[in-house]
Regions:
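N-terminal export leaders
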Residues: 4-8
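N-terminal signal peptide c-region/cleavage motif recognized by signal peptidases
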Residues: 18-19
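Basic- and aromatic-lined ligand-binding clefts that recognize polyanionic substrates
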Residues: 27-44, 130-178, 241
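Structured C-terminal subdomain patch of bacterial secreted/periplasmic proteins
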Residues: 27-28, 95, 118-138, 209-263
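A short, structured surface patch at a secondary-structure boundary
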Residues: 27-92
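Alpha-helical, coiled-coil/dimerization segments enriched in small aliphatic residues
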Residues: 53-58, 65-68, 164-189
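Short helix-initiation/N-cap motifs at beta->coil->alpha
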Residues: 67-77, 94, 114, 186-194
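Short helices/loops that flank or line small-molecule/ion binding pockets
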Residues: 75-84, 104, 192-203
Length: 263
């Protein structure tokens, strides 16, 4: 009788949440968006990822090792079939799927997307905590450089002649890397090609498009390519800008190296 009672209590204990500080790390984690994919490939333990989202394959972007990660197709049926004990998603993605999973009792954790460099470590610590990892593993922020009024000007140029100004995450990355932002206006601004050619930046950072498009015609203007020659057109994966995370410090480091090479 006592043995049977002990067995029953042990079985019930397995269904109850662990006490404070005793929660077991999740064993089957599923991501619903690209940024969550990336942070999981950085910090999840071997075998802890049940599946990543289909976004990396769809857009040809993946952080960390390219292959070997299981993926789901984004459907409710397939995610449920994975039996996840934790689903990770950003605040602006897969909202309908997230709600349906929550309605079915699946634990969904919505992470905070960093909007400043100071928030990158906060985001990283949050994810480490959700995975049962050590939050102290979050990367230390890159130190701020000394103010240099003679620092070269860098233009971050997007499609349709839209440039990134001050008061933006991208602008903060530029300054942390020791550049001056070419565009001193706040936010995102449409450039005038004549004004740009008359006063060109030291370099242009351009995310190369996957395929030719009219939206990229501004960047291909002959006059612009003349005043800013090919060696001063810098290229990075645009997804590294759209998904702030610990890899952002790699981007800062890359921009710093380019700045040093231009001296």
């Amino acid at each position: 009788m006592r043995a049977r009672r002990a067995t029953l209590l042990l079985g019930l204990a397995g269904l109850l949440p662990a006490g404070p500080g005793l929660a077991a790390p999740p064993q089957r984690v599923v991501s619903l968006d690209l940024c969550s994919d990336w942070i999981l490939t950085v910090h999840a333990a071997p075998g802890q990822i049940a599946a990543l989202s289909p976004m990396g394959r769809r857009f040809g972007a993946r952080y960390g090792p390219v292959g070997g990660w299981p993926e789901h197709d984004g459907s409710l049926e397939q995610v449920i079939a994975l039996r996840p004990d934790r689903v990770i998603v950003g605040p602006y993605n897969a909202s309908r799927l997230r709600q349906r999973l929550q309605a079915l009792g699946v634990r969904v954790e919505v992470t905070a997307l960093p909007t400043s460099l100071d928030q990158v470590a906060v985001f990283e610590r949050q994810v480490l905590g959700l995975l049962g990892g050590d939050p102290s593993r979050a990367r230390a922020p890159a130190p701020k450089p000394a103010a240099d009024p003679a620092a070269p000007r860098l233009l971050v140029l997007g499609a349709n002649g839209i440039a990134t100004g001050r008061g933006t995450f991208e602008g903060e990355v530029i300054e942390r890397a020791g550049w001056r932002n070419y565009l001193q206006a706040e936010g995102y601004q449409r450039l005038d090609i004549e004004a740009l050619v008359a006063d060109p930046p030291a370099a242009i950072l351009w995310a190369a498009p996957v395929s030719p498009a009219l939206a990229n015609a501004f960047a291909g203007h002959r006059a612009l390519r003349t005043v800013v020659p090919a060696p001063r057109w810098l290229h990075t994966d645009n997804w590294r800008w759209e998904c702030p995370g610990p890899w952002t410090w790699d981007l800062v480091g890359q921009l710093r190296r380019w700045r040093e090479e231009m001296r």
